[in-house]
Amino acid sequence: MERIPYRDADLLLSVLGEHIGKELLTVRSGRKIPNRWKSSFLEGSILLGRIMKVKNHHVLTGVIAEKYVPYEQQYSPFMFLALEIFSKIPSLDRSSFNLLEKFLTSEHRAKDFDQLLVSFMINESLQPSLNSCVVCGEKREQFPISASVFLGGYVCSRCGSGDIELNQADYESLLRTYRKVGELTENMRSYWLDILESQLSTKFLSREGLK
């Protein structure tokens, strides 16, 4: 999640651990850590894997900096899916991690996950296109357009009416309206997850847990 400047021969890494929390690790090196490692590998787990395979580089210490404990004893399938999604993102900024942190400290309801999913995809510019109807795929000709919060995008006049009129490709307006409406339907949640899988060229195995 973060690379924290420390010393030429050491490096502090903040990583998301298997215990569903954040660990702060100190990497001790026998020689100066190459700059290409610090800049090329954005995921702490990848960098740690490289360091642990090279002579004179090893993890010196590790402490739990933060820990996120769900309200219920049993973990929600939405929580596993959220963690899998974030584990497959090449790099994350602080605002995206804050969305995950907020979800991990929530009650893990469908509504909580939907807020995370939509906010994250819009924040990372991974949302469905506003250039074609989300129902039939017909290309839009011009603005203004009718957009559906539940469908997650533009809806042409033949396929129904939306919840909001947009005068430009403005997902922030759609997101603000969505937050007032609440959770997605199961079909619409699946549609957004399909879009995310397509954008990331991957499949989320944890989706099976939602059935």
Cite the ranges covered by each PLM segment.
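Non-catalytic alpha-helical scaffolds and adjoining flexible linkers that form interface surfaces
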Residues: 1-11, 16-211
